[in-house]
Amino acid sequence: MAILEEPFAGVLELRNYVDGEWVDSEGERRDVVNPATMKTIARVPISTQDEFDAAVEAAQAVYPEWRRTPPLARVRCLFRLKELMEEHFEELSRVQTMEHGKTIDESRGETRRGIEMVEVATGIPTLMMGYNLEDIASGIDEYLIRQPLGVFGIIGPFNFPFMVPLWFAPFAVATGNCVVVKPSSEDPISQIKIVELAEEAGIPEGVWNVVNGGRNVVSAMLDHPGIKGVCFVGSTPVGRDVVYQRCGATGKRVICQCGAKNYAVVMPDADIERTVASCMTSFFGNTGQRCLANANLLVVGEGLDAASLDAFYKDVVDAFVEASSRITIGYGLDEAVQMGPLRDRAKVERVLSYIQKGVDEGATLRLDGRQFELVSDLPRDCFVGPTVFENVTPEMTIAREEVFGPVACMMKAGSLDGAIDMIHGNPFGNAASIFTGSGRWAREFQYRVECGNIGVNIGIAAPMAFFPFSGMKDSFFGTLHGQGQEAIRFFTESKVVIQRWF
């Protein structure tokens, strides 16, 4: 397969996009580094609070006019944005690979999912409709309408720099709101590319703004009285203890989609070959840096004696290790590569510390990600190979805490009840999957497991754009989720009108 050309050369000097203008920042500038090559590809400003405030002011100024814009007119802008994204599909995908490190196939998938968010949001004339009832009393009618609220803030994560802000922004804009997006300062280029296309699509000045920055911009967003709601995707400590708490204190609407420790449950009737193939993507896709990544593979011996469970467990683990060992590692623009680097050195050190902790706590290291081969001559700084532990118990650190890297824990349970208890012993509730041919086991699993996204013979339980991206327990803080009808409700207020004519 070919090694693809990079979509741009040199070092990009990024700016903020506020009120339809590209604006320089007075803040310091930080390097954006390609984690595969360790070359600086851009410099991003760490904007000031005043610069964020200016973006909110611009959005507030245009909001009344944008709100009054007919839904079909708003939709035409979004439909044009979708068309432009399709035209620039490959460029947008390669940018993600350069700035994040994921493989080009993963980037193309992310681009497609992001475009689908815009596509679904173009259905807003129907999605935003209210409802009515005549003659609730003699000569009196009642109906509900949905109205936008104002300006929303969106805080993007590093792991999906293109897609995640699009879980929210198209729905907010389609319903008549304005947005200020703060991309991750680690990989902000994708959001700059999106807003360039939004400008070309005819979205009015001030409706869709991008302000780069760090904690100071987040803090300004959480405290600003002009921000009606905040959408956050990131770690549980930040989401729960900072964003959720401070939005509550200031009366903002909030979506906090947070961390995870997802289980994949393998029942005795599962097709091992197909299950393992699905797990390669769900455990090691995006180098394990996603909230829907599976982390613990739980082999279940429902109806088996101890010896049979041990034999089944061995068959599954051996197949998993063998498949993991064949994953090719390198620069994601090489189409033969199946796994790229972690985002930066700090994340590598974090993952390595968990690998060592697993060894220290007595788990068996079947595949050591500290020892790996690259398919080409690259700096090894940000790479870690697939790592597989077996004989992992629920109390071990690697089984309990979110590693956010390519580390798989092999575990076993004697029954489906025991497996569900093990899942519930973890504080997270983002996703869980079961592999089985039994409808009875699958229904029991999906009915009882306290996770927001359930996969049945699906490794990555990723909802489509017209369904909400759910989450429970320490994986989600808020009331409504992003995507689909719940996003429409989040970005609008319900107004009830009761009328009588004399």
Question: What kind of region is each of these model predictions?
Answer:
Residues 41-47, 62-68, 154, 264-267, ...:
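Short, well-ordered beta-strand elements within core beta-sheets of diverse protein domains
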Residues 38, 74, 96, 176, ...:
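Residue-level signal for inorganic ion chemistry
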Residues 39-42, 203, 227, 265, ...:
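Conserved C-terminal structural/oligomerization subdomain of aldehyde/semialdehyde dehydrogenase
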Residues 229, 237-393, 417, 456, ...:
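ALDH superfamily catalytic-core signature
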Residues 130-275, 309, 413, 478:
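Rossmann-like NAD(P) dinucleotide-binding subdomain of oxidoreductase/dehydrogenase enzymes
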Residues 39-129, 139, 328:
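Glycine-rich loop-to-alpha-helix module at the N-terminal edge of alpha/beta enzyme cores
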Residues 1-37, 370:
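Hydrophobic face of amphipathic alpha-helices that form TPR/SEL1-like repeat modules
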